[in-house]
Structures are given as structure tokens and as C-alpha cells.
Amino acid sequence: VVRQLRMIKSPAELALMQAAADIMAASLRYAGERTRDGMTPEQIDALIASAQKTLGGSYDGGLILIGEASAYPHGSHKPHVVRKGEIVLMDCTCSVHGYQADITRTFVFGGAPTSEQRKVWDQVHRGQQIAMAAAKVGVPAGSVDDAVRSTYESWGYGPRYKLPGTSHRTGHGIGMEVHEPVNLVHGEATPLAPGMCFSNEPGIYIPGKFGVRLEDCFHMTETGPKFFTTPPPSIDDPFGA
């Protein structure tokens, strides 16, 4: 019963989630601008934690994936350090008075992206847009995942959850917990309703090379989905305004 009630957020709850999202986005931008050659994931993570503390958020940890490690949604056990031309993926959370934000940014360090890096980044960016277009009040939550996945398959990824492609759900519910019902995953029949909150993170992963994940959370309104944070516009401006 409690979980059912928590699926729908009140205006006060949405305001706390907005505050957490604003802090999280600013902290990722801060860390990205201060990332240097040779840095470890732990050093980048420390930059994010420092920024969050300064801005008034509670840092709940993050996942920093560099180079080939970004090709696996949850990373690898190999040690990696930042090098020019490599992907840096930062997937981190923040809470304000117990309400969560979850944002991922992916950028190329120290140089122009390759044509393949740019293509995949643009495809994930498009995937976020497809998810938002599919997220309509009353439709099954799983239909959002289906819309993204069908497009990715038309681009040659998959099929379904196979790599290269997207091996995880398009999004998860978020609120007092980072991961809570309902999920944007194939087969989920729960209809979308105003006040529901989700991540939007249709990453693409190419084993042995790299991955790109862009993640912004949104909430459903009477007229459709609304982002808490604006997705960055391009790989050349990977943190946005």
C-alpha cells in the first residue's frame, strides 16, 4: 500500500526532487570542468561529492566509468584513468531531505570526439527524445521502453536487450529511493499517471569499445512528461546550460 501511494508525488515532493536535480546537475558540471589527464574514478567522484556538499545536497554515491569500462552499464573491475580522447561517464545521485535525483553525463575528455563516439552520443540523445514522446498519461509504462528499443533495433542494435545496444530498461521509478516502482521496461502494464517520476536513460553500449549513457529524470503532468533537468544538447556541450 505504501509503495502504491509513493508512486504519485505531491507538489512538495516534486519541489524537493527538483532541488536535488539542480544540485546534481551543477555538481556533474563542476566535476567535468575539473577532470584532468590521469585522474582515477575515485578522484572524479571526490569532486562531485565536494560540490554537492557545498551546494547543500547529500551525496549518495556514483559510478564513474572511463574508456572501455563505459561499455558495460555497471563498469568493469579493470583499473582505468582518464586519457585524452576517451569517454568519461558519470552516473550519480543526490538527495535533498530524503528525495532523490539520478543523472548521467557522458563526455569525451581532452579532444574532439571520433565519428563513432559522436554518432552513438547523438543516438542516445535521440533515444531520450523518443522516450519523452512516448510517455503519455494513460499508456502502459512498458510502451516507453518499447518505443526506444524498436528505434534502436532499426539502427542495428540488439535485438531486444542484447549488446551492442541497450541491455537495461529505459528508466526506473524514483522518489525517496533511487530505484522504486514503476519501471519503464518491456511488459510493464501500469498506466502512466500525473505525479509519477522516472529516470530516462536509454544508454547504448558497445563491448570492447565504449558506451554512452545520458540520464535525466522527469515527472508526469496532466499534459505529459516534464524533465527535472534539461538534457545537454550535444557531445560538444555535454553538460548544457
Residue positions per predicted region:
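Active-site neighborhoods and metal-handling regions in enzymes and metal-associated proteins
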Residues: V1-A241
